[in-house]
Regions:
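N-terminal Rossmann-like FAD-binding beta1-loop-alpha1 element of flavoenzymes
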Residues: 127-153, 271-280
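Feature captures the FAD/FMN-dependent oxidoreductase FAD-binding
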Residues: 62, 123-132, 180-228, 322-330, ...
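Glycine/serine-rich phosphate-binding loop and adjoining beta1-alpha1 elements at the start
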Residues: 14, 40, 44-120, 187, ...
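Mid-to-C-terminal Rossmann-like scaffold of FAD/NAD(P)H-dependent oxidoreductases
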Residues: 8-10, 14-30, 307, 320-323, ...
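Rossmann-like dinucleotide-binding cores of NAD(P)H-dependent redox enzymes
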Residues: 151-154, 158-193, 276-321, 431-446
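Glycine-rich dinucleotide-binding loop and its adjacent helix/turn
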Residues: 107-123, 181-196, 201, 223-282, ...
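A conserved FAD-binding loop/helix module that cradles the flavin
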Residues: 275, 399-433
Length: 498
């Protein structure tokens, strides 16, 4: 049930009295549909402008239904996506970008609270597909294949679904009940999930299970190692294993990793920030990060570092570990050259820590490919695929962390959808053709009569002094704020019923 249309933020101007702050029209407009920049920037391929318009009208369930046509995990993505759509938003040229992620989260949470159900899938095709891995890419692919009428089974090596959503993102950013309930909806739609089942031989699993196609979506769960000279090393862990142990300890009541009183994390990415903040919540007195570049050159998002510092975590910039002697960590002070690369200075310092967590990146375990002749692997350790995400083996597709791309949740989700649509076409003996795209619309093409100031809504944030557990830090929008925020959308490239 939709609500009444919101009042326009900008009143209808009387052009006989004033011309406003935008350009003056001297000719009648011509209808020319264009591509909104938010849609263009979304790695999951969401039609953001469409569901924002429905949300503005108060048609929340219809907005959610439109959203899950492209992305089955809106409550998850509204929390963990780094929202490149907002960086592209034309509204940012006037005041603030539309808080798209907050509205997506609102719709996802409303669906969970109200028990909304997806539309029925297409008629059964009679085809069976095996998905290897229950991370964001595998879950997305399974969902879209199910929507298209195919029978899908996911086989997951771990004890729980979610992949890096569960074992790489702490619960203070993504509550586990939110993840569990969105996964449960995918399974309730008809997808089968088999846990604790590591696929060792893909072709054998395909043939014995009678599957017509396979999508490999194995995440990057192997930590990259670095050789650090150590006379007598203290406890050294990798960040991926540490975060996984901490997650299982929180969810299943298992003992948390033992770190001692002081812990150092080596690395400058988002995983390093998550590891440090998780360690603080596990009770360490001091958590520090050691990183060889400066703040401007770190791979972590700026807000991640700021939140870590708010929680009392010290970041040692321009420091590189040279050797370890029990609890003493010798670091060399670095400087950046003209290209921003760290170079040694010959100056050394000693830091103290009872444990060292290495957060230097992750790799995919590609041992599953050893039994598959013909699959090409690049020197970077990723699978070579065609534009339709199929490998050189007919019917064998791959996506997410396994293929060349940036490794984010939303990109992995987009890969799952893309693979599903190409797999559907392949299973039916056809080729998938992406819908025609319109030209991208920029701010100079909007022809705004008035540039009304309407600042973005703010989500409630738990103060730093209260962040002593794994409770969620950032809250959601209420109905009024969600509709207001959706109304801030310029509806770029489309009619917004003025």
């Amino acid at each position: 049930q939709c609500m009444s249309k919101q009042l326009d933020m900008t009143p209808q101007p009387d052009l006989s009295q004033k011309t406003g702050t935008g350009p003056v029209r001297t000719r009648l407009p011509v209808w020319q549909p264009a591509l909104p920049p938010c849609n263009h920037a979304c790695p999951a391929g969401e039609n953001i402008q469409a569901w924002l318009a429905l949300a503005e009208a108060g048609c929340f369930e219809a907005a959610w239904q439109r959203l899950i046509e492209e992305n089955p995990l809106p409550a998850v993505h509204g929390r963990v996506c780094y929202h490149p759509c907002e960086s592209a938003c034309n509204r940012a040229q006037v005041d603030d970008a539309v808080s798209i992620h907050a509205i997506e989260r609102f719709l996802g949470d409303e669906a969970l609270a109200r028990g909304w159900l997806p539309a029925p899938p297409a008629p059964a095709s009679g085809k069976k597909v095996l998905v290897i891995g229950a991370g964001p890419s595998g879950l997305s692919c399974a969902w879209h294949l199910n929507r298209l009428g195919h029978q899908v089974e996911i086989r997951e090596a771990g004890p729980l679904a979610g992949g890096m959503l569960r074992f790489g993102i702490p619960a203070y950013r993504l509550p586990r009940d939110v993840l569990d309930r969105e996964v449960a909806r995918i399974l309730a739609a008809g997808v089968t999930l088999t846990l604790n089942h590591k696929v060792e031989d893909v072709l054998k699993a395909r043939d014995e299970g009678g599957f017509d196609a396979v999508f490999m979506a194995i995440g990057a769960h192997l930590a990259k190692r670095v050789d650090i000279p150590a006379r007598e090393a203290g406890k050294i862990l990798d960040a991926v294993s540490f975060l996984e142990q901490a997650s299982l300890a929180e969810e299943q009541g298992l003992p948390p990793p033992k770190l001692g009183r002081r812990v150092a994390i080596y690395g400058g990415g988002n995983t390093a920030m998550d590891a440090a903040r998780t360690a603080r919540r596990l009770g360490v007195e001091e958590a520090m990060i050691i990183y060889r570049r400066d703040r401007d050159h770190m791979p972590a998002h700026a807000f991640e570092a700021l939140e870590a510092e708010e929680e009392g975590i010290k970041i040692n910039w321009l420091r590189s570990i040279r050797q370890i002697d029990n609890t003493n960590i010798e670091v060399e002070v670095m400087a950046l050259d003209a290209e921003g690369k760290p170079v040694p200075t010959g100056k050394f310092e000693t830091l103290e820590a009872d444990s060292l967590i290495l957060a230097l990146g992750q790799e995919v375990d590609l041992s599953v490919l050893e039994s598959i002749p013909g699959v090409r692997v690049s020197k970077e350790g990723v699978v070579q695929v065609a534009g339709n995400l199929m490998t050189d083996v007919p019917g064998l597709f791959a996506g997410g962390d396994m293929v060349p791309s940036e490794r984010t949740v939303t990109i992995a989700t987009g890969h799952g959808k893309k693979a599903a649509r190409h797999m559907d076409a392949w299973l039916r003996g056809r080729h998938y053709h992406k819908p025609l795209s319109y030209p991208l619309v920029g701010p100079e093409q909007l022809q705004l009569w008035f540039q009304t100031q309407a600042p973005a809504s703010s989500q409630p944030v738990k103060p730093a002094w209260a962040r002593d557990d794994f409770g969620e830090i950032i809250g959601g929008l209420d109905v009024t704020a969600a509709r207001y925020e959706a109304a801030r959308c310029y509806s770029c490239g489309n009619c917004f019923e003025c």
